[in-house]
Each structure stands twice: as structure tokens, then as C-alpha cells.
């Protein structure tokens, strides 16, 4: 069930989250922050506009509230949109800290602002179990459940934007959720970029270390997160790939929204891989692999890449990049490969 323009339930906790989120977002001088679909009508045509959106999906009679965050420039969207991008977050944080990070003096770290200014209609979500979306069910919110969220969110976005397809970018376990969703709903996906992806986990030092704590994570639906854990994302593979002020802003943004996150994707990536089948992914695909990223071996990714059926596919190695590419020093490289992929023209001749 898809509910158009659904508002967040008026619980005390949800109202507090909404007030905090609105206040934090308003600090960005470069962004006009408003609520609801009326924002586009009153905003300056050259300014990035922000909107909250909500939809609901049903799981065995239980309504699941899903939060979405949209950024775009109305004038560009109305006249010459380059398409709609849905950004999908990973295991340890919700959507906005990853894709709409506000760093003082460094506006480039808001990926959504960057692509909105290029003429894209950009969206991200909080998967069930994260931040503003529902957390009430007693499950660990695994990768398959995240793909269910994407089915509901994509239907809402396509109906709202009156588009037939959207583009996807998934980071880390977000890439697995995005790929699984694209396997299930190929008709909704125009192109898909999989960053910090892993297929079987063979040869992954990160997952080898993670398996040492699988007993702990298998026994609970949530795990705590703190500043040290977030900082370790930028040091575990190759220290120095990210600036300290960006890492600190990232940690601040995450911890203002959540103090714990689901264990499901950690469990899946540790002991349940593979969860994706490359033969079923029909859309054009770009695999993005940071030079220093320890989440997957080159062999594992190349084996997956070889089995992708669409000839429109890319395997990109990003030099000087580790796991969290959108928050690192070589961000311009990441943007360059994404811009090229998302704006690639359709082939005139296909044989």
C-alpha cells in the first residue's frame, strides 16, 4: 500500500525527531529548507529545495512508515530534468548524513546538493529500523527487508515525479539492497551504481574481522554506534583518505539521529552471502571500487561483474579511495565517474 504525502505519526519521539531534523537542516545557508510539496512553488527557481516525504508499506498487516528526503531545483526539474536518482544508505547510518552531509566551508560533501545543481531530482530514504522510519517490529531489518522498502519508496517516487524509471546509487550494504531491488523490479530501474559492493565476501578482510563478532550480532536486533565506531570506517582500511573535519561532521550528523542501528545487514554480509544474483540484474551497472576498500576483493567483484548480462556495464577503480567514498578527499573522482555514468547516452547501435 502506497500512501501519498503521508505525515509522520504524532508521537512524542517522532515530533522531537522532526523538530530537530528541521532545525539542523535550516543551518545550511545554501539550501532552502521547507516541508512538503508546496516548497517548489514558493522557492527561488535557482535554489536547491528540500522536501520531506512519507509513504507506508504493509508487512503482514503491520504498517511500515518510511521517510524520504528530496532535493532538487524546481526550475531545472520542470524544464530539463536529467532524471531521478535514489540514494541508498548502508548499515551504520540513515540516509541524510550520508547523502546530504553539511560541512562548514565544504558544500561539496552534500551529494544531493551536487546532483540537484546538475539538474537531477535527488532522493534518499531511511530504511525501516533507521532514524525517522518505523522501528517497532522485533526483527533485525536485513538486506531483503531493505529491498522491500525500496519497492515501496520507488513506487511513491515514480508516481510523485511522473517518471517511468529512476537511477540508483547504493553504498556498502546499500548497494546490496539496491541490487536486490533492481533484480526484483527491473522495469523501474534505468541505471544502477554499486559502490563498496560485495558479492560472496570471499577474500574480504573487513568481513573476516566482522565474523569474529557474529555471535554477538546474531543474538540481538540492534547494535550500538558511537563516534569511535564511525571514525573507524575511515581508518580501518587506509588512514588519511578523509579530512578530520569531514569525519567529525559525519559522526555528528549520524549520532544526532541514531544511537543504535539494526544488525541485519551485518549478519547477512558476514554469514549469508551471496544475497544478489548478477544474472537477474538487467539494468546498466557500474561497479565502483575504492583502491583501499576492504569490504570486497577484486576477484569477488570481477566474478560478479563478468556475470552481469547487460553489455552496458563498467568496473571503476577509484584511486586513493577507501570505503566511504562520498566523504573522502578524492570526492571529485567519485563525482566524475557518477556524472558520466548517469548521463551516458543510450546506444544508437546495439548489434
PLM regions with names:
Residues 207-288:
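Alpha/beta-hydrolase
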Residues 294-300:
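Conserved alpha/beta-hydrolase "acid-adjacent" motif
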Residues 321-331:
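Catalytic histidine-centered segment of alpha/beta-hydrolase-like enzymes
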Residues 77-81, 85-117:
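Short, surface-exposed "cap/lid" segments of acyl-processing enzymes
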Residues 1-15, 26-29:
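N-terminal secretory signal peptides
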Residues 148-165:
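Conserved acidic catalytic loop of the alpha/beta-hydrolase fold
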Residues 12-19, 29-42:
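N-terminal twin-arginine translocation
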Residues 42-77:
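N-terminal cap/lid segment of alpha/beta-hydrolase-fold proteins
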Amino acid at each position: 500500500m502506497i500512501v501519498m504525502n503521508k505525515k509522520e505519526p504524532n508521537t512524542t519521539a517522532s515530533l522531537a525527531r522532526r523538530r530537530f531534523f528541521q532545525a539542523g537542516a535550516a543551518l545550511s545557508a545554501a539550501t532552502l529548507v521547507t516541508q512538503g510539496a508546496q516548497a517548489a512553488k514558493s522557492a527561488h527557481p535557482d535554489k536547491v529545495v528540500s522536501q520531506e516525504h512519507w509513504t507506508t508499506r504493509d508487512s503482514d498487516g503491520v504498517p511500515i512508515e518510511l521517510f524520504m528526503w528530496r532535493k532538487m531545483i524546481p526550475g531545472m526539474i520542470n524544464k530539463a530534468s536529467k532524471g531521478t536518482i535514489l540514494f541508498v544508505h548502508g548499515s551504520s547510518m540513515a540516509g541524510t548524513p550520508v547523502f546530504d552531509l553539511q560541512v562548514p566551508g565544504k558544500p561539496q560533501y552534500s551529494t544531493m546538493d551536487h546532483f540537484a545543481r546538475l539538474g537531477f531530482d535527488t532522493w534518499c530514504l531511511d530504511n525501516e529500523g533507521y532514524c525517522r522510519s518505523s522501528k517497532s517490529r522485533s526483527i533485525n531489518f536485513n538486506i531483503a527487508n531493505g529491498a522491500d522498502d525500496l519497492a515501496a519508496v520507488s513506487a511513491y517516487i515514480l508516481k510523485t515525479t511522473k517518471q517511468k524509471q529512476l537511477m540508483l546509487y547504493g553504498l556498502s550494504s546499500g548497494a546490496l539492497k539496491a541490487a536486490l531491488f533492481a533484480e526484483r523490479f527491473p522495469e523501474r530501474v534505468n541505471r544502477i551504481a554499486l559502490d563498496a559492493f560485495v558479492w560472496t565476501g570471499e577474500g574480504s578482510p573487513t568481513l573476516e574481522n566482522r565474523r569474529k563478532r557474529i555471535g554477538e550480532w546474531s543474538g540481538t536486533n540492534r547494535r550500538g554506534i558511537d563516534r569511535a565506531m564511525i571514525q573507524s570506517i575511515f581508518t580501518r582500511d587506509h588512514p588519511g583518505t578523509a579530512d578530520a573535519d569531514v569525519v567529525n561532521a559525519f559522526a555528528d550528523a549520524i549520532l544526532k539521529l541514531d544511537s543504535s542501528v539494526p544488525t541485519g545487514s551485518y549478519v547477512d554480509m558476514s554469514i549469508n552471502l551471496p544475497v544478489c544474483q548478477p544474472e537477474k540484474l538487467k539494468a546498466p551497472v557500474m561497479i565502483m571500487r575504492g583502491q583501499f576498500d576492504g569490504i570486497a576483493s577484486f576477484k569477488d567483484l570481477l566474478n560478479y561483474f563478468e556475470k552481469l548480462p547487460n553489455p552496458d556495464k563498467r568496473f571503476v577503480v577509484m584511486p586513493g579511495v577507501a570505503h566511504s567514498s562520498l566523504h573522502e578527499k578524492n570526492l571529485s573522482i567519485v563525482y566524475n565517474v557518477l556524472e558520466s555514468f548517469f548521463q551516458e547516452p543510450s546506444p544508437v547501435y546495439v548489434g
